[in-house]
Amino acid sequence: MRELVHIQGGQCGNQIGAKFWEVISDEHGVDPTGSYHGDSDLQLERINVYYNEATGGRYVPRAILMDLEPGTMDSVRAGPYGQLFRPDNFVFGQTGAGNNWAKGHYTEGAELIDSVLDVVRKEAESCDCLQGFQITHSLGGGTGSGMGTLLISKIREEYPDRIMCTYSVCPSPKVSDTVVEPYNATLSVHQLVENADEVMCLDNEALYDICFRTLKLTNPTYGDLNHLVCAAMSGITTCLRFPGQLNSVLKLFAVNLIPFPRLHFFMIGFAPLTSRGSQQYRALTVPELTQQQFDAKNMMCAADPRHGRYLTAACMFRGRMSTKEVDEQMLNVQNKNSSYFVEWIPNNIKASVCDIPPQGLKMSTTFIGNSTAIQEMFKRVSEQFTAMFRRKAFLHWYTGEGMDEMEFTEAESNMNDLVSEYQQYQDGTAEEEGEFDEDEEWMR
């Protein structure tokens, strides 16, 4: 029933994806060879959301791995769960995109895209009732951003009524990987606004901060960052994989979280995040988890929710707890911090409870927020974009692959429109008409 197809693209997407399958397999009791060694029927009840069952009771991830160079694929294959994936589902080129969006979207990526789509079709056709696609990729590089968005638009053409959910690692303000990140990210956002249904924004700097400040790690590795992301990804899909009380399909997320079709960029958070030494000093209670998941320090993207207002939010609690207490806490949050929620959407926090906690925890919670503060991230990228584009820096790399300057201008204005839309709903109030009348009186 209700299957998902998972696609990972580029170096970043493949590394996050590989970690994600480790976490998910652990939760469903699937070992690195694909055999089931779990201890509960619940692990198998909806295992087909993410796995196909092969001969001999072997579980194979419904995952498609793509990249324009073989390097990352090889390391995934050599990793702990490398033998889990179906060999036909590795699709890679040899040239690499060289951090160039145009190469991923128009030249190198376009040559490889048909073989990726064949695998996507094969996986989609073997589903009973496909509910959608999830894609992990980054927006700053070439493959994940350029080819990732190309794939998203192709899937959109072929499966227009299926949900498209992306986990996108956005360029972070201080941790920069390449100089052309602002170009790649802006061109990608231009595509994601039109073709994706839900975009979970992540970024390395915010993840580093969580590792330093909250988890007290002295030198966090990418493995640690990916682990954080996967904890949240696993939490978001919990209600699809285990019996729960709300949000059991991806479409319901969209319905509950997106008030206007273009505003589908979410912040995600996870709790409990405690450093190894201080776990015994904290109680895992619903109020504690609620307080921690709304904490600005727990957000996995570099935007501060205190600088904006929440349009909507969803919280997925896991573990044995009373639903009544969860509902009370949600009301409590809205009443105490009412200025941080727009007043023209009543009860804008949705909560769901799933009885099965993640490995090694009694209870946990994952948070998805649609906050107007996400515009900070777009503004930052947009400023860097404008600074470079004004001088036409590095443009020849893109025009050389057949792109037009017009596309850059369009992407820039689309991003700026997005920022001003968020700002408009942040400032908007429920009694706008009444307020204008008073202002006019005062003017006279």
Swiss-Prot record:
Its cofactor is Mg(2+). InterPro entries: Beta-tubulin_BS, Beta_tubulin, Tub_FtsZ_C, Tubulin, Tubulin/FtsZ-like_C, Tubulin/FtsZ_2-layer-sand-dom, Tubulin/FtsZ_GTPase_sf, Tubulin_C. It comes from the Eukaryota. This is Tubulin beta chain. It comes from Phytophthora cinnamomi. Gene3D superfamilies: Helix hairpin bin, Tubulin/FtsZ, C-terminal domain, Tubulin/FtsZ, GTPase domain. GTP binds at Q11, E69, S138, G142, T143, G144, N204, N226. Tubulin is the major constituent of microtubules, a cylinder consisting of laterally associated linear protofilaments composed of alpha- and beta-tubulin heterodimers. Microtubules grow by the addition of GTP-tubulin dimers to the microtubule end, where a stabilizing cap forms. Below the cap, tubulin dimers are in GDP-bound state, owing to GTPase activity of alpha-tubulin. Keywords: Cytoplasm, Cytoskeleton, GTP-binding, Magnesium, Metal-binding, Microtubule, Nucleotide-binding. The lineage of its organism: Eukaryota, Sar, Stramenopiles, Oomycota, Peronosporales.
